UniProtKB/Swiss-Prot annotation:
Gene3D superfamilies on file: ATP-grasp fold, B domain, Phosphorylase Kinase, domain 1
Annotated EC: 6.3.2.6
Gene name in the database record: purC
Similarity comment: Belongs to the SAICAR synthetase family.
Reaction(s) this enzyme catalyzes, per UniProt: 5-amino-1-(5-phospho-D-ribosyl)imidazole-4-carboxylate + L-aspartate + ATP = (2S)-2-[5-amino-1-(5-phospho-beta-D-ribosyl)imidazole-4-carboxamido]succinate + ADP + phosphate + 2 H(+)
The protein's name in its UniProt record: Phosphoribosylaminoimidazole-succinocarboxamide synthase
Entries under HAMAP family matching the protein: SAICAR_synth
InterPro entries on file: SAICAR_synt/ADE2_N, SAICAR_synthase_Vibrio-typ, SAICAR_synthetase_CS
Amino acid sequence: MSLANQVLAVNDDLPIRTHKPVHSGKVRSVYWLTEEDSARLIKEKGYDVAPDAPLAIMVISDRISAFDCIWHGEGGLKGVPGKGAALNAISNHWFKLFKDNGLADSHILDIPHPFVWIVQKAKPVKIEAICRKYITGSMWRAYANGEREFCGIELPEGLEKDKALPELLMTPSTKGILKGIPGVPEADDVNITRQNIVDNFEAFNFSNAKDIAQYEKLLKEGFNVISSALEAIDQTFVDTKFEFGYVHDAAGNEKLIYMDEVGTPDSSRIWDTKEYQAGNIVENSKEGFRQFLLSHFPDPDILLNKERMPEREALARDNELPVESLMDISRTYIGIAEKITGQPIKLSNDPKAEIIEILSKEYGLID
């Protein structure tokens, strides 16, 4: 069995019964179930949601995105072996830990397969909820260029690259391109201030202004839960991105929940603590792959400059990366997933066939 066959690269062509177009994101695809199938599964499986709640099947892929592009390797390798299963396993672990610690629920109702979640449809808050404990990445680049205000937060003089910030900082950005919000550029992933959110909470999809404080509370508490757990396995939680949304519970009450993924190598920076204490940065996250790309191509500005997006897209489309570069990230993802969960990540020889069989036999969702 070749490496290419072990990778689930295309995840929006499964024969899952749906009445709407499949939503295909950078890594996950979403299949909206019919009203009949949603109601049937809620009843059959006993999901704790309203009887008429809309459900979806969310299928993760092994694709690797960085700098807003999808990358591929030599020999037809269209993703990273084990990446999808590792990301889902990590998120599942943290969502359970959040619940154990009395934090909010997630949108996940069931996990039929390592690549698959059954989720309740949520109304997403249009914010990338970013939390930073250390100054690195885009924040450091801005600081090194002389900026002393970041997302409306005044930064003191004397901060050093890759060192701890004086306090945990929330530095939100827009989720998608938002139009017509005063002071917010109409571009993807634009840094915003807390005041931007307060002044325009409805435009960011908050149901009411009071929920801004609730999202901040859940962001900080979630960060601290993950940070403490990682500390116990000699890992440092550097920064992360959460997403939030609204669902209705079985009684019809609206509640703010965690959604998408949390605390993964895709959405976070995680450093090896012992190496960090020795003065080295060893990434257990996608940052290692980003750094590889920056050194692999002769003009790294293409990857960093948003005005050169057409060149960047061509770079990703036309260049096959060395297989070893994708296997490096595979080892990183599987390794950190196994450390976090305490369980082995098993690679499937044919994940697509497995998913179809389970969703057919156990859920009756395949035509």
